[in-house]
């Protein structure tokens, strides 16, 4: 006996499969699991007849407000559909009998999916899927997104079950996983060294790590965040090496978010400086305790008491003065009191009672990330809870992967890392953003699905925000007509540097000149970057990276400027100079001279000629001139002609008489003062 599938019957009756399933189970007692289930042809015929006599069973099939014409059109369409079904009936019945016992194909998607991706999942040509959408009343291009309901209709027509992915709840569960108190054990403190430029942050870390890195770093400024673990008296301390320059405010603030204790370095001879104040404010905002290290106390002119006094002005009262701020006088150069400083750090950490659960799934933060030519995506992760193992699947922001290899801060291969331990990992699909959170998940498939969902959300958010910003900018530029824009493409060796440069450049924007970072990324400057710069009329900035040969050739051909730097401060200063060069000059009024009208003459076809006596300075032909009567400016124009006797002259000096006419002004009267002036352009020297 022949059978028919539920979705086919639903099509014939012009109702949704969901409504028909409810109808079959509730009203007719026919057991069906989903729209791919089959029912006997006899049952289907009975249902058709019953519904033909009682159309009220079809929920929402006909509305009371429908016109008679609409009803006839619908009936006609149903008849046409039935005719098509009859032509293919025999083939379908045979096929149904053969496939009845086969497992129905199921595919999973998120809230939305592009037409191209859906076609790939269905293993059908994109054109077929687009055609199906058109028959469903949806006009969509190959790269256009469609929602779950629309995709479900398409899958239904191909006999495929579509299920919605629900991965958000799982990720939230991972993030919100609570730890039992009995599973918590003591963990090492995570310490960040902060302070003003050249106050000795890197030198202090040198003294702590017994490794000289200062001399190898350009300009004496730490170029990007590294992470190191040291052992003191049997206890471990993890140091985050954050850049100390003012341009790295964002990176320093991010460092404070994963930090337990901050060592605030203040030079004994300099005292509190702008970046020191910045560091203090970041620590207070993050609620991170500080241990003050007064450095360079062995230097001539050192005055630790003055530093302590200045600290008091910023709400940090040292212990010896009755406060609660731990302060240690040290010298990174001579290793003076370094051990004491570390003991104070451990004491502060002990008061915080830092604990973590080693037995749970790992989670933490990306400290740094870069693209290595030989190893691919390399990320420095700081494990903040749980234990990370080689082979674990992780999701990092909108990136995912399985850890192929893991290295400690000395470059040694390790198999696992517990809380507060920084590790360098290989195996991520892309370079993550520095500061991204990472979570261990059950398998790589789950990680990929989560990452894809996050990417889709970021993409839609950026498209929405991008459209809004563009429209607002376009409106304001049209309205003002004066806004200039400097387009920049940023490439750097590590993600942290990219973020720092981007944030510093954004701060340079003013009402007159806007800085727009068109593209930024990690890696060498490529031909693609030059092509983008050409199209966007932008300059290319490289930090610790070089352009490849193709990029250089393309840049020469297209006249694109490539500038490379080793110190970020220099890059920011150069961009600032370029912006200043784009500014309109300021104008200053310079008085050339003034004259009194002694007599007036009216000449036909010429107008009123003023006979004047130059009181001071000089009058110049074509100079801007204002007419002043009784101390009030009544007109501004140019001197259209200037004569001495019958001769045309360019200028007339003090004490001489002359005849002149003011352009478009014939109401000159005796006693009027004519003041000549010019607007002198002054090149702007600052934003």
From Swiss-Prot:
Residue ranges of the region described as G2: 220-224
InterPro entries from the UniProt entry: EF-G-like_DII (IPR053905), IF2_II (IPR044145), IF2_N (IPR006847), P-loop_NTPase (IPR027417), Small_GTP-bd (IPR005225), T_Tr_GTP-bd_dom (IPR000795), TF_IF2_bacterial-like (IPR000178), TIF_IF2 (IPR015760)
Region of interest called G3, as start-end residue ranges on this chain: 241-244
Chain positions covered by the region annotation G5: 331-333
Gene Ontology molecular-function annotations: GTP binding; GTPase activity; translation initiation factor activity
Keywords per UniProt: Cytoplasm, GTP-binding, Initiation factor, Nucleotide-binding, Protein biosynthesis
List of residues binding GTP: 195-202, 241-245, 295-298
Start and end residues of each stretch annotated as G1: 195-202
Region (G4): 295-298
Record-level GO cellular component terms: cytosol
SUPFAM superfamilies: Initiation factor IF2/eIF5b, domain 3, P-loop containing nucleoside triphosphate hydrolases, Translation proteins
Residues spanning the signal sequence: none
tr-type G domain: residues covered: 186-355
Gene3D superfamilies: 1.10.10.2480, P-loop containing nucleotide triphosphate hydrolases, Translation factors, Translation initiation factor IF- 2, domain 3
Subcellular location: Cytoplasm
Protein family membership: Belongs to the TRAFAC class translation factor GTPase superfamily. Classic translation factor GTPase family. IF-2 subfamily.
Cited PANTHER family: TR-TYPE G DOMAIN-CONTAINING PROTEIN, TRANSLATION INITIATION FACTOR IF-2-RELATED
HAMAP family: IF_2_B
General function of this protein: One of the essential components for the initiation of protein synthesis. Protects formylmethionyl-tRNA from spontaneous hydrolysis and promotes its binding to the 30S ribosomal subunits. Also involved in the hydrolysis of GTP during the formation of the 70S ribosomal complex.
Protein name: Translation initiation factor IF-2
Organism: Clostridium botulinum (strain Eklund 17B / Type B)
